[in-house]
Amino acid sequence: MIVKISRLVAPLALVLCLAQASLSYSVLTHQAIIDSVWNDSLKPLLLKRFPSATEEQLREAHAHAYGGAIIQDMGYYPFSSKLFTDLTHYVRSGDFIEALIAESQDLNEYAFALGALAHYAADTNGHAKGTNRAVPVVYPKLRARYGDEVTYADDPTSHIRLEFGFDVVQVARGRYASDAYHDFIGFKVAKDVMKRAFAKIYGVEMKDIFTNLDFAIGNYRRTVSGLIPEMTKVAWELKKDDIEKNSPGITRDKFVYNLSRADYEKEYGKDYEKPGFGAKMTAWFVRIVPKVGPFKALAFKPPTPEAERMFMESFNATIDRYQAMLAQVNGGKLDLQNADFDTGRPTRAGEYKLADETYAKLLEKLAKDDFKTTSPELRRDILAFYNDLSAPIATKKDKSDWRDTLRALDKLKAAQAEPTRANSK
C-alpha cells in the first residue's frame, strides 16, 4: 500500500512543481526574442567583441543565447532549484545580468549573458504590459477582486492557463517552423560564467542549491522537448480549420512536431529523469481531471482578442527594449535596475510577496555561514531592502519567520564589510 501511495504522490508533486511556474512568456517566446534580434543587433554585437568568430561558432553562440534567454526559469521545473529562479527574479535581478556580462570570457559565455539580458527585458516588460493586464480581461471575476492588474502571486492558475493559451495561438498561426522547435530544444548553458556571476551577486555557490546542475539542465531540456509537441497537438485540435486555411495542404503529421525518445537521447544524451510509472500516471491524470485540484492550472484557456492584442503589444515593446539594451551594452552604458520580474517595478520591501519571501530565504541562508560569503555590495542591498521595517513585508505574517528574519538582520548589521570567499575565487 505504501508503494502504491508513493507512486501516486510522485506525479502529484510533479504537477504541483510545474504549477508554481511564474512565466511572463513561455520558453518558445523567450527564444523567439533571440531570433527576432539576432541578425540586426545580437550577432553584430558578438562579432564586435569576437571578430574572428566563424559561422559554425556563431551557430553555437546562438544556442547559448537561447539558453541564456530561458535559464532564469529553470528552477520552476522538476529536479532543479526554485531558490535559483526566485533569486534571479526578485533579488538583484539587474546586478546578476550585469555580472554575467562582465564575467563572460569567450564567445559562448558572452552570448549566454546577452541571452539572459533578453529574459530581463521580457519579464520586466511582459508581466507589466502583457500578462498582468490580460488576466483580468479573460477572467472578469479576478478583475472584480484585484482590479485591472492581476499578478502571478494574486492568482497563479490564471497566469499559467493564459500563458499556455498564448502559446497555442502562436503555434497555430505558424509563428515557428519545425526547424525552430529543434533549435529551441538544443539550447546550451554556459555553466562556468553562470556559477561565477551567481556566487558574486548572491554570496551562494550554485552547488549548494542544486543537487546536480547537469541533471537539472537535462531535465529542463527534456521537459521542453515534451512540452513543444504537446503545444502543437493542442493547436491542431483546437485551431485545425484556421491552420488549414493559412497553410493549404497542411496535414496533422506535417504540423505536429514529434521528437522520439530515441532521437532525443541520440542528440542530447540520457541525463534526465526517465518517464516511469509516475510520469505515465501524471499524463493520465492531466487528461482525465484537468480542472480538478492541483491539475486545474494545466487547463487550456484561450486568450480573448483584447488579451491577445495586449500580449503582442508587450512582445513588440520587449523587442524594442531589448534592442535598446543591446545598444547600451555596445556603448558600455548598460545600467540595469534591480526590478521585480513579476511586476516590472523596482524591488523594495512590501512591494511583492514573493520578493519579500526570497529576501528572507537568502538572508537566512547567508546567516548560517555567519555572512562569510556576503560581499559589501550584497550586504548593502539587503540592508537597504530592510531599511524601513514598518513596510508591509509579507514575512511578518508568520511571527516565527519574522523573528528569525530580524535576528539574521541584526547579525548582518554587526558583520564587517570585508572581502568574502565568494568574491575572492
Where are the regions a protein language model picked out?
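N-terminal signal peptide c-region/cleavage motif recognized by signal peptidases
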Residues: 19-21
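Catalytic glutamate of the conserved HExxH
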Residues: 116, 120-124
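Short, low-complexity Pro/Thr/Gly
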Residues: 8, 228-240
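Short, linear, compositionally biased motifs with a strong N-terminal bias
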Residues: 12-15
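N-terminal, motif-rich segments that launch catalysis or mediate targeting to/interaction with membranes
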Residues: 23-111, 124-208, 223, 237-242, ...
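Eukaryote-specific, cytoplasm-facing alpha-helical/coiled-coil scaffolding segments in long proteins
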Residues: 217-227
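Bacterial N-terminal signal peptides that target proteins for export
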Residues: 1-10
